[in-house]
Amino acid sequence: MEFKQLPPLAAWPRLLSQNTLRWQKPISEGLTLLLLVASAWTLGKMVWVVSAEQTPVPTWSPTLSGLKAERQPLDISVLQKGELFGVFTEPKEAPVVEQPVVVDAPKTRLSLVLSGVVASNDAQKSLAVIANRGVQATYGINEVIEGTQAKLKAVMPDRVIISNSGRDETLMLEGLDYTAPATASVSNPPRPRPNQPNAVPQFEDKVDAIREAIARNPQEIFQYVRLSQVKRDDKVLGYRVSPGKDPVLFESIGLQDGDMAVALNGLDLTDPNVMNTLFQSMNEMTEMSLTVERDGQQHDVYIQF
């Protein structure tokens, strides 16, 4: 193999000039052909785009077969009746069984003092003023006596029955000794009629006898004029008055069954703690001024012992 010697470096410019003139024509023809092809391709693409925009393309829509135009509401009654999670049953309160009151209960050993009682024909409206360690308070049926675990169970004219740890016990009225059980209230005697002989004298004699009994023990007034506390929304409205074991005094002073007592000797009976003050001053009373509401009007009733 023979190797030709390359021309010297100084001869390169001359050689390049000769070769350029020789290749100029083929290069120009190739570039011209390439430009023509590119122009034709661009023109064809523009024509295709314009024709495609003018031709409308139909919009596709699904074919509905066997379907109703109106939507039917979903029936969930079957699910509701299925009781998937069970049947809700509202819990029923267990009936309250009231235990009978033991009227001959033994005397209590608790250091309590019964200062006064307001016995009512409706046992739930009876009240008792009980002092424990020098502190007096008024209690209703089933209320727990402050400072103890005992609760008031029944109120009688001369005593109360308390339930202490499930055991009935008797608390006597202050100043009275424990005796035989208190008897039930005597039924109301027949009212005297004006056409009966000696009816008026008997009525007046009975009233005088009751006044004398009250003068000896002013708390006896509550055996002939019963007071029942009336509340609304935990607020004391007063005390409903009703005749006691003998209605002669009740009628003689002008009271009517259902009157609402709102004041007694100037004491506001709507005060929840007024009974404490009332029973403390009972033994010093010689007369009683009772303010009652009747048919929306107030009336003052005076009782002299």
UniProtKB/Swiss-Prot annotation:
InterPro entries: PDZ_sf (IPR036034), T2SS_GspC_N (IPR024961), T2SS_protein-GspC (IPR001639). Residues 1-29 are cytoplasmic. It comes from the Bacteria. PROSITE patterns: T2SP_C. Residues 51-305 are periplasmic. It is a single-pass membrane protein. Its main location: membrane. Involved in a type II secretion system (T2SS, formerly general secretion pathway, GSP) for the export of proteins. Required for secretion of cholera toxin through the outer membrane. This is Type II secretion system protein C.
